């Protein structure tokens, strides 16, 4: 019957899908220093990235192409066999992003927007992710169905659903560090907003237990966030005090940015001074740098919460044009009775 034919067709498609999965072996996680193919290594991005989907500071997506050309895309060695397995390698290693990443719809990451396969190893992100309406936003990867190891993020994150310090949604995440401010609607976490499958937390736990490194596990510092979707897990997505986090990242040789809270005072897109402050302390505006003078304008630093500083901030100089003429409040026949000419700031007019 036609129903039987349809059933056979669907069963055949499922078998073909299973065969395709067995045909490819991802060897990215066994990367060594001597491996050079299928690898992005020691790269830095400082530029702004803008995309609708899959926006990343280093790469947009890590996935296998649908079309495979056996002649050009594969290497053969040894005797011929009907049982063929293709080994694939997609590795991003020792890369740094400092550029802002903007994604409109889905998949924004400091290093990679979307990971279907491959590994991100020992990579850092310091670029903010500005994606108020997008799903899957992460400090390292927006959406990862694969492996992230020994990576770290310090940035501001904004998104809709699935917003995470390391991955918006992740699978295997080990040995990673997060110091972020994250804002989202649902599924928000300092390590991951969510996990890619119901057994991901088991997979994560097994990976941590099997690790021989003393720095196994994922750690973060935050006064407001939980580790994974608002919940912290000892040894897997665990909070530390700021001092403990500083000691750990120093021991691991991570960049100084992970141990500093900095106020950047900027005027006309030029940094006037970068002031390092103590985590959680108040900043006295009397210690702010002198504002650069701009003829015909008054100047002040933009307002910010300086009573409890827990993250880097950029404070912009705000310039307001001086009034060249001021008038009295008293009028005669609807006109001011007195005009004064000069250069007046708002605070000088009473």
Report the location of each language-model feature.
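Conserved "repeat-terminator" motif of extracellular CCP/Sushi domains
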Residues: 252-266, 292, 304-330
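Short, solvent-exposed loop/edge segments of extracellular or virion-exposed proteins
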Residues: 131, 182, 264-280, 329-344
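Surface-exposed loop/turn motifs in large extracellular/passenger domains
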Residues: 1-188, 192-260, 293-296
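Residues that cap or initiate secondary-structure elements
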Residues: 49, 101, 129, 271, ...
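Surface-exposed interfaces of beta-sheet-rich extracellular modules
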Residues: 38, 90, 212, 281-314
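Extracellular, surface-exposed repeat/solenoid domains
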Residues: 348-350
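A generic structured-segment signal
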Residues: 106, 270-276, 282-290
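Non-catalytic surface loops within mature trypsin-like serine protease
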Residues: 222, 279, 321-323
